[in-house]
Amino acid sequence: MPAKLNHVAIASDQYPLNARFYESLFGMKTSSKPRPSRSVVVGDGYVGLNSIPRREGRCSGIDHFGIEVDDLDDTIARITKFDAKLEAVKRPPVRPFAAWSAHDPDCNVFDLSQRNIDFQKDVYAELGGETRPRHISHIALRTPQAERCADFYVNVFGLTRQNRPDGNFYLSDGRVTLMIIPWKIGDYYGQDPARSGLDHIGFKVESVEQVKKDMQFLIGENPLMHGRPLGYGEEGEARLKLFQKCPLGCFHLTDIEGTLIDVAE
C-alpha cells in the first residue's frame, strides 16, 4: 500500500486562533483528544493539520509534513538505500503523532508514522476515511534539487508521478499531491528571496465564491479571523505573482500566521 501524506504542522505564535481559522473557514474538525498546552489539531478526514506553538529560534509558518507508512523499519531501510547519508531520528515519546523524523536529499524534514499503531491517538487516526467538502488537496515544497527529491519520494514512499507540462513535479498518494517546485533565486526578482522549504498548502472546495463569502462573514463575526494582506506594494505584488504560478489554485489567501493557501474547485 502506498504511503499516505497524513499531516501538516504550522508553527504560530497564535496557534489556537490559527487552528480555529481552519475550523471556521474550511470546516475542519477539532480533535476529540485535545492537548491545548502543546498544540491544537484539526483535520479534514484525511489530512491532519497540527497548529503548534512557535518555539525559540524557529520561524512561523509551515514547519513540516507527515507521512504514514505500512512498515517503519522497511521505510527507514529504503531511505538509507536511496542515499546512505540520509538519516532518521526517533521522536520523543511525548509526541504521539509520529515515531520518527527524517529528511529528503535537500534536508526538508518530515515525520514518519506507521499505520494502525497505538500512539496515533489524534485526529489523524480518528477521522480516517471521512470526506469533507473542503479538504487539503496539495502540499507544495520549493527546493533546489527538485528532481532528486521527487525521485526520493517516488522510490521510498511509492508516490505516483502525475504528468504536467511545466517544470514542477507532482506526486500523488491517491488523494493528496506533493508538489515539488524547483527553488531558483531568480524567481525572487523584485522581492526578498524566501528560503527553500515548504511553500504553501492547497484546498479543494465545493465553491470558491462561497469561500470568499464565508471569509467576509467570518471577519464580520470576529475581526481577529483575518489573514495577512496579499499583493500590496511592489514586493507584495511580485510575491503574489510568484504564488499564482501554481496551477493547482485559483484563489489565494493566507491564514492568520501568514501561511500561504490557494483554493480551487
Cite the ranges covered by each PLM segment.
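Core segments of cupin and vicinal oxygen chelate
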Residues: 2-48, 94, 140-185
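Structured core of small recognition/catalytic domains
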Residues: 147-231, 235-245, 249-251, 256
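N-terminal beta-strand motif that seeds the catalytic metal site of vicinal oxygen chelate
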Residues: 1-16, 62-65, 115-150, 177, ...
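Helix N-cap motif at beta-to-alpha junctions
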Residues: 14-15, 69-73, 145-146, 206-210
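Fold-core signature of tandem repeat domains
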Residues: 5-8, 26, 40, 62, ...
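Vicinal oxygen chelate
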Residues: 80-132, 170, 216-265
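Exposed loop/turn and edge beta-strand positions of beta-sandwich/beta-sheet ligand-binding modules
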Residues: 4, 61, 96, 135, ...
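Short, charged/polar, Gly/Pro-enriched secondary-structure boundary elements
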Residues: 46-50, 57, 107-110, 120, ...
